[in-house]
Amino acid sequence: MKNQLRSSFSTQGRRMAGARALWVANGMKKEMMGKPIIAIVNSFTQFVPGHTHLHEIGQQVKAEIEKLGCFAAEFNTIAIDDGIAMGHDGMLYSLPSRDIIADSVEYMVNAHKADAMVCISNCDKITPGMLMAAMRLNIPTVFVSGGPMEAGEWNNQHLDLIDAMIKSADASVSDEDVAQIEDNACPGCGCCSGMFTANSMNCLNEAIGLGLPGNGTILATHANRTQLFKDAAALIVKNAYKYYEEGDDSVLPRSIATRDAFLNAMTLDIAMGGSTNTVLHLLAIAHEAEVDFKMDDIDMLSRHVPCLCKVAPNTQKYHIQDVNRAGGILNILGELSKGGLLKTDVKRVDGLTLAEAVEKYNICKKEVDTEAKRIYSSAPGNKFNIKLGSQNAVYKELDTDRANGCIRDLQHAYSKDGGLAVLKGNIAQDGCVVKTAGVDESIWKFSGPAKVFDSQDAACEGILGGKVVSGDVVVITHEGPKGGPGMQEMLYPTSYIKSKHLGKECALITDGRFSGGTSGLSIGHISPEAAAGGNIGKIVDGDIIEIDIPNRSINVKLSDEELAARPMAPVTRDRKVPKSLKAYASMVSSADKGGVRIID
């Protein structure tokens, strides 16, 4: 072999008799020794609907790999459900879990000297955590997500989790209606059905190049999702041999996830109005890959990439299943490439360049590829279902309408400015992020008095208690990576603002972050954060906050001298922080660096 198998340290030589005995006890056949050992990194848990259907698939992937002569071994990572952890101190653990996942994958794979990986991820911190590990390890890797949930339905309208949250806090909605919405919003397994963080990351993985076509959009319940796992099993064996036998390093994560690939992924995110959390995660993944990709790159892209796709929560018309029907991520990338907005010579895990992939999977050409038609015809089963790949409904026709359909061409873009913007100013000298795709253009310029809260809990009480009125800017401080610690998502405050019918009349700014389900004038990731001495921690009630999205600025109306002389506002909250999170806070950076741990 041109590259020595990592596993040879435990399978070769007389002195490794004990290790070989243990491999045999694990089910390895003698003829498998000396061949690649492939780790199956699963994230099954019954705490998270995005992962509850992954129990058996790891063993099915193992069986497919072993048919091809290699030994495969499965292990699990933790997985936190942000929706269940939200609204209480459980959310403090969500972002730190990303690093725990990355560490645990590195520990397991390096300790046992696995040669390659299939990563079975799905929800918010699991996909980025595994991607961070893949960049550290840099061994042949294929990602397959568990897939998106079908959209719910009630009163002939599509629903999702965010609808349940908003309606439950709206006094004009009856208890009976809330109960029915609650029962129908999440009809089974998969990650929540809009362009929230989980789906955003699984879609971006297709642009990064480590996810197969359909990774981000084929429904969890569809048979074609199961086929994707089979394809991944065959591909990882092929790529393992390409690297170790042939010395072909083009299959390695760092060869695929180059600077150009990160630029492509961010371009996609802006074009589809993805979650602002993707900014945090892409910065962290690039950090692990030792790729020079920073907030300034995101700012540059946001100024000229148009919005070509709007999905819930940015509209109620479309959910992820509709993106799939319109040709999925490769067809959004195809439209972007027509405008010269992508680097199409980048490599992909399937061996294609991006240019070759967007051509092969283009559903708008006269002769549609058979595989493309199979993938993008995958339709919802429209009934409650928690079993992976258990239905095979198909759309009668694909959505190829690029003027008025789910995916638009450049000439019919939703807006010439994309779905994300980076703002800077005296509140956020190192930047902050807003999902413009979810902001009504009438409030892209907004000015109002600050209503300051030093915790998410206090903000929720203030909003529900009527302390926030039309024209206010809600300011939530000390919720950044260090200050939280853990950088909580602010979905409940933004949902409560909507439930009070103030969605177009108020803004919210924070050094915390937002759920992918957030829309409205919600500005997060303010850096430096309050706990790192950032000026957001100096704002007091009544200060005038000026937000100007077109000019990419955010400022408090104070002179530099006034701001420099003003002390940090006192923190009045009573929050008990466990040692595990204190350790995290002692190492973590602000959001403009991806919230990564800074370790000398």
Curated annotation (Swiss-Prot):
It catalyses: (2R)-2,3-dihydroxy-3-methylbutanoate = 3-methyl-2-oxobutanoate + H2O; (2R,3R)-2,3-dihydroxy-3-methylpentanoate = (S)-3-methyl-2-oxopentanoate + H2O. The modification N6-carboxylysine is found at residue 125. Binds 1 [2Fe-2S] cluster per subunit. This cluster acts as a Lewis acid cofactor. Its EC number is 4.2.1.9. PROSITE patterns: ILVD_EDD_1 (PS00886), ILVD_EDD_2 (PS00887). One of its GO terms (biological process) is L-valine biosynthetic process. Pathway: Amino-acid biosynthesis; L-isoleucine biosynthesis; L-isoleucine from 2-oxobutanoate: step 3/4; Amino-acid biosynthesis; L-valine biosynthesis; L-valine from pyruvate: step 3/4. GO terms for molecular function: 2 iron, 2 sulfur cluster binding; dihydroxy-acid dehydratase activity; magnesium ion binding. NCBIfam families: ilvD (TIGR00110), PRK12448.1 (NF009103). Functions in the biosynthesis of branched-chain amino acids. Catalyzes the dehydration of (2R,3R)-2,3-dihydroxy-3-methylpentanoate (2,3-dihydroxy-3-methylvalerate) into 2-oxo-3-methylpentanoate (2-oxo-3-methylvalerate) and of (2R)-2,3-dihydroxy-3-methylbutanoate (2,3-dihydroxyisovalerate) into 2-oxo-3-methylbutanoate (2-oxoisovalerate), the penultimate precursor to L-isoleucine and L-valine, respectively. Homodimer. Belongs to the IlvD/Edd family. This is Dihydroxy-acid dehydratase. It comes from Phocaeicola vulgatus (strain ATCC 8482 / DSM 1447 / JCM 5826 / CCUG 4940 / NBRC 14291 / NCTC 11154) (Bacteroides vulgatus).
